[in-house]
């Protein structure tokens, strides 16, 4: 992907405006999950090492544009950075008409979503952001699918617009998995509905050698194969779509499943053959035989793309399928990339974070990239790089 990279630029004495993803959960003024901040710190340190005058900003929550709201302030992020960095970090609320930045400090510009015109990519706001800097650095993959003033507009008007290390790594990893994957390539697509992942499935059917489906998506494929799914979550109207996909792509249907009588943490799990599901039962996980068969497919894969669990792994009784699949991915020698909220929760639960080749930081952006869509914030960086 031809974008200018921050790592290749001389930033000495330059005013650098970094758009990061610091949209972290906050409770009682304290950051409760610091993953996104920790991911951004190396970018900030690199900019400082290169002698830049560093500004960084992000969105946080959903404030009303034009109104400052303490609940959506980046102050907890500033407090976190001050506690974890050896350089002074200060928060500036009013910065659109200019801000003084010194070398050796980090200036955090208050939540971009407080600025009128941010979401609709108002060109005047984009120009104001651009006037603050010599170099704009887009480093928030999680918002790259949105054309907003701080992700797109500023990149149009800044003297130089480039990709930060996080964004560049994300694009490289996704490119490696989707553009020229080492084969065989296996995709794991879980989730409750075929309809929400239809474009993902269609796109992957043209790339992957095999697609493993899980969750409610798998139930629709089980029904398409002619089996009773009882009270399971599935989409009857999408059975023809599932049949077409199964006819053109290798999509293994589970041979056994775990069922329950109610959707609850305490529901008892019964393992049975896929053709023995009763009318009052719901499928909540794949069975051991299916999990082992799929683990074998994963073991032989050279590229693995993972988006979504294969069962209701939040409930201990219906966790085993996702656990077996997760460990198979972790133990595979192939290149693995994982993305999506539920997938990240499974990675944390099973303690396999260090064994996945690349974990994507973007939910919606990850899916849109997999669907083959152009991400606006990346598109504008490419345009700027190519004059």
Swiss-Prot record:
Record pathway? Carbohydrate degradation; glycolysis; pyruvate from D-glyceraldehyde 3-phosphate: step 2/5
Record's Gene3D superfamilies?
Answer: Phosphoglycerate kinase, N-terminal domain
A Pfam family cross-referenced in the UniProt record is PGK
Calcium among keywords:
no
GO biological-process terms attached to the record: gluconeogenesis; glycolytic process
Substrates-to-products reaction catalysed = (2R)-3-phosphoglycerate + ATP = (2R)-3-phospho-glyceroyl phosphate + ADP
- Residues binding substrate are 21-23, 36, 59-62, 113, 146
The EC number(s) attached to this protein equal 2.7.2.3
- Give the keywords, sorted: ATP-binding, Cytoplasm, Glycolysis, Kinase, Nucleotide-binding, Transferase
Where, by residue number, does ATP bind? 197, 314, 340-343
Cross-referenced PROSITE patterns: PGLYCERATE_KINASE (PS00111)
From what superkingdom does this record's organism come? Bacteria
A single GO molecular-function term is: phosphoglycerate kinase activity
Q: Which GO terms describe its cellular component?
A: cytosol
Its chief place of residence is cytoplasm
Protein localization: Cytoplasm
Assembly information from the UniProt record = Monomer.
Q: Which PANTHER family match?
A: PHOSPHOGLYCERATE KINASE, PHOSPHOGLYCERATE KINASE 1, CHLOROPLASTIC-RELATED
Q: Which family does it belong to?
A: Belongs to the phosphoglycerate kinase family.
The name of this protein is: Phosphoglycerate kinase
